[in-house]
Design a protein with these regions (language model features):
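Terminal targeting/leader modules
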Residues: 2-3, 8-160, 175-195
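Amphipathic alpha-helical interface segments used for dimerization/assembly
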Residues: 162-174
Length: 195
C-alpha cells in the first residue's frame, strides 16, 4: 500500500516465509524485507477499572511468519484470564528513504517493533470483536505518523537477529543530514525577519 510521499511498510502477504524454524534459530534476513506474524493478547482488567472495561487488548509479540500459520487469524490460547490470537502474513519492508527512522530505532537502548492495530467494529472470526493488526514497522517515523493520526500503536522488543539486520541496513543506507548553521535573528534585517 502506498500513499503519496509515504511508503507503507506492511502489506498482507499470501506467500509466507518458507522457514519452519523457531525465532532463535532463524538467520537474519538477507534482503530488505521479512514476513512476520503478530500475536495479540486479550487480558482481564484488574481493580477498579474493571467496572468500565472488563477486558483490554495488548500487543504480545511479533514473530517470523511460518507456512504452518496459514493466512487467517487464529486463536492460540483461551482461558479465564487471557486469550491470544495469531495474525499471520505481514510483510515488513525497509526503505532507503526512511533510513533515519530505522536509525533512531536501531540506536536506542531497546530497539523494537511498532504495530498499529484496530479493534474490529463487528466480530468476524470470534464471538466478540478482536484486535486486528494493520501495519508493522521498525521505523520511529512510521510510529510517529500513526500516533499523529490518533491510531493505536504499541511496541515490543525486537530480537537480536532483527536488530542486527536493521543495523546493517542503517549502516548501508543512512546518511546523516549535514548541520547547517543558521544566521542569528539579530543579524538579519527587519525586512527579512518580519516580511
Amino acid at each position: 500500500m502506498q500513499r503519496s510521499g509515504v511508503k507503507a511498510v506492511l502489506q498482507p502477504c499470501r506467500h509466507p516465509l518458507q522457514s519452519e524454524c523457531m525465532l532463535t534459530d532463524t538467520p537474519p534476513p538477507s534482503s530488505t524485507q521479512i514476513q512476520v506474524a503478530v500475536v495479540m493478547r486479550r487480558e482481564r482488567v484488574q481493580g477498579a477499572m474493571s467496572r468500565w472495561q472488563p477486558w483490554r487488548w495488548v500487543l504480545a509479540d511479533v514473530v517470523p511468519n511460518e507456512a504452518a500459520f496459514g493466512e487467517e487469524p487464529r486463536q492460540l490460547r483461551h482461558g479465564d484470564e487471557e486469550e491470544q490470537w495469531l495474525h499471520p502474513g505481514f510483510l515488513v519492508q525497509l526503505h532507503r528513504d526512511d533510513a533515519e527512522g530505522y536509525y533512531l530505532n536501531a540506536t536506542t537502548d531497546a530497539p523494537c517493533w511498532f504495530v498499529m492495530w484496530r479493534l474490529e467494529e463487528q466480530a468476524t472470526v470470534a464471538a466478540e470483536p478482536i484486535a486486528r493488526p494493520v501495519m508493522v514497522s521498525l521505523s520511529y517515523y512510521d510510529a510517529g505518523r500513526w500516533l499523529d493520526a490518533q491510531e493505536t500503536v504499541e511496541q515490543v522488543p525486537a530480537p537480536v537477529e532483527i536488530v542486527q539486520w536493521l543495523s546493517g541496513f542503517v549502516e548501508e543506507n543512512h546518511v546523516p543530514e549535514p548541520k547547517r548553521r543558521r544566521r542569528p535573528e539579530s543579524f538579519r534585517s527587519l525586512q527579512d525577519r518580519f516580511g
